[in-house]
A protein has these predicted regions:
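Short, flexible loop/turn elements at secondary-structure junctions
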Residues: 7, 18-21, 111-113
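Hydrophobic transmembrane alpha-helix bundles
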Residues: 15, 19-36, 79-95
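Hydrophobic/aromatic beta-strand patches that form the interior of the parallel beta-sheet core
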Residues: 13-15, 47-49, 108-110
Length: 116
Protein backbone atom coordinates (compact mmCIF):
# COMPACT_ATOMS: atom_id res chain seq x y z
CA UNK A 1 0.00 0.00 0.00
CA UNK A 2 1.37 3.37 -0.96
CA UNK A 3 -1.00 5.60 1.00
CA UNK A 4 -3.54 4.92 3.75
CA UNK A 5 -6.02 7.74 4.25
CA UNK A 6 -7.61 8.05 7.67
CA UNK A 7 -10.19 10.28 9.31
CA UNK A 8 -10.48 10.46 13.09
CA UNK A 9 -8.28 7.36 13.31
CA UNK A 10 -10.44 5.29 10.95
CA UNK A 11 -9.29 3.98 7.59
CA UNK A 12 -11.24 5.59 4.75
CA UNK A 13 -9.20 4.71 1.66
CA UNK A 14 -6.22 2.75 0.44
CA UNK A 15 -4.20 4.07 -2.50
CA UNK A 16 -1.99 1.73 -4.53
CA UNK A 17 -0.08 3.33 -7.38
CA UNK A 18 1.92 1.93 -10.26
CA UNK A 19 3.57 3.21 -13.41
CA UNK A 20 2.82 1.30 -16.60
CA UNK A 21 3.83 1.50 -20.25
CA UNK A 22 2.15 -1.81 -21.16
CA UNK A 23 -0.34 -4.26 -19.68
CA UNK A 24 2.23 -6.14 -17.59
CA UNK A 25 -0.15 -8.70 -16.08
CA UNK A 26 2.28 -10.03 -13.47
CA UNK A 27 3.04 -6.55 -12.15
CA UNK A 28 -0.62 -5.51 -12.21
CA UNK A 29 -1.84 -8.65 -10.43
CA UNK A 30 0.75 -8.17 -7.69
CA UNK A 31 -0.56 -4.65 -7.03
CA UNK A 32 -4.21 -5.73 -7.11
CA UNK A 33 -3.63 -8.57 -4.65
CA UNK A 34 -1.63 -6.32 -2.31
CA UNK A 35 -4.24 -3.60 -2.32
CA UNK A 36 -7.44 -5.59 -1.86
CA UNK A 37 -6.24 -8.61 0.09
CA UNK A 38 -2.77 -8.48 1.65
CA UNK A 39 -2.89 -4.92 3.03
CA UNK A 40 -6.64 -4.55 3.45
CA UNK A 41 -7.96 -6.67 6.33
CA UNK A 42 -10.80 -4.23 7.09
CA UNK A 43 -12.26 -3.98 3.60
CA UNK A 44 -11.40 -0.33 3.11
CA UNK A 45 -12.35 1.46 -0.12
CA UNK A 46 -9.45 0.89 -2.49
CA UNK A 47 -8.04 3.02 -5.31
CA UNK A 48 -5.62 1.34 -7.71
CA UNK A 49 -4.03 4.06 -9.80
CA UNK A 50 -1.92 3.55 -12.91
CA UNK A 51 0.22 6.30 -14.38
CA UNK A 52 0.41 5.31 -18.03
CA UNK A 53 3.16 6.21 -20.49
CA UNK A 54 1.92 4.32 -23.55
CA UNK A 55 2.06 5.34 -27.20
CA UNK A 56 -1.67 4.67 -27.67
CA UNK A 57 -3.49 5.41 -24.41
CA UNK A 58 -6.93 4.31 -25.64
CA UNK A 59 -5.56 0.98 -26.85
CA UNK A 60 -3.78 0.55 -23.52
CA UNK A 61 -7.00 1.27 -21.64
CA UNK A 62 -8.99 -1.32 -23.62
CA UNK A 63 -6.34 -4.00 -23.00
CA UNK A 64 -6.06 -3.03 -19.32
CA UNK A 65 -9.84 -3.07 -18.81
CA UNK A 66 -10.08 -6.42 -20.60
CA UNK A 67 -7.44 -7.82 -18.25
CA UNK A 68 -9.26 -6.43 -15.20
CA UNK A 69 -12.52 -7.94 -16.48
CA UNK A 70 -11.06 -11.44 -16.70
CA UNK A 71 -8.70 -11.33 -13.71
CA UNK A 72 -9.16 -13.97 -11.00
CA UNK A 73 -9.59 -11.71 -7.97
CA UNK A 74 -8.54 -13.10 -4.57
CA UNK A 75 -11.86 -12.05 -2.99
CA UNK A 76 -15.47 -12.73 -4.02
CA UNK A 77 -16.87 -10.26 -6.56
CA UNK A 78 -20.19 -8.63 -5.60
CA UNK A 79 -20.48 -6.17 -8.50
CA UNK A 80 -18.75 -6.84 -11.81
CA UNK A 81 -16.26 -4.27 -13.04
CA UNK A 82 -17.73 -1.48 -15.16
CA UNK A 83 -16.26 1.53 -16.91
CA UNK A 84 -17.00 4.96 -15.45
CA UNK A 85 -17.20 8.35 -17.14
CA UNK A 86 -14.33 10.72 -16.41
CA UNK A 87 -13.88 14.49 -16.78
CA UNK A 88 -11.36 14.33 -19.65
CA UNK A 89 -9.58 12.16 -22.22
CA UNK A 90 -6.43 11.71 -20.11
CA UNK A 91 -8.25 9.81 -17.36
CA UNK A 92 -10.02 6.44 -17.58
CA UNK A 93 -11.78 4.71 -14.70
CA UNK A 94 -13.55 1.52 -13.70
CA UNK A 95 -15.36 0.37 -10.58
CA UNK A 96 -16.26 -2.91 -8.89
CA UNK A 97 -17.28 -4.23 -5.49
CA UNK A 98 -15.61 -7.15 -3.73
CA UNK A 99 -16.34 -8.80 -0.40
CA UNK A 100 -14.15 -9.68 2.55
CA UNK A 101 -15.69 -11.66 5.41
CA UNK A 102 -19.17 -10.73 4.10
CA UNK A 103 -18.28 -7.02 4.11
CA UNK A 104 -18.58 -5.40 0.68
CA UNK A 105 -16.21 -2.63 -0.34
CA UNK A 106 -15.52 -0.65 -3.53
CA UNK A 107 -12.44 -0.94 -5.70
CA UNK A 108 -11.71 1.88 -8.12
CA UNK A 109 -9.25 1.49 -10.98
CA UNK A 110 -8.01 4.71 -12.53
CA UNK A 111 -5.46 5.39 -15.24
CA UNK A 112 -3.82 8.71 -16.04
CA UNK A 113 -2.18 9.33 -19.40
CA UNK A 114 1.26 10.81 -18.68
CA UNK A 115 2.75 10.27 -22.15
CA UNK A 116 4.98 13.17 -23.13
Amino acid sequence: MDILLTKNGNEIAIYEGMKLNSVNTTYISTHIDKAIKNYNPLGTATYIIAYVDAINYNDFWERYFNYLSTYKYPLPIKTLITKKKTPNAAIKAAFMVVSRDEFDFPVYFMTFNIEK
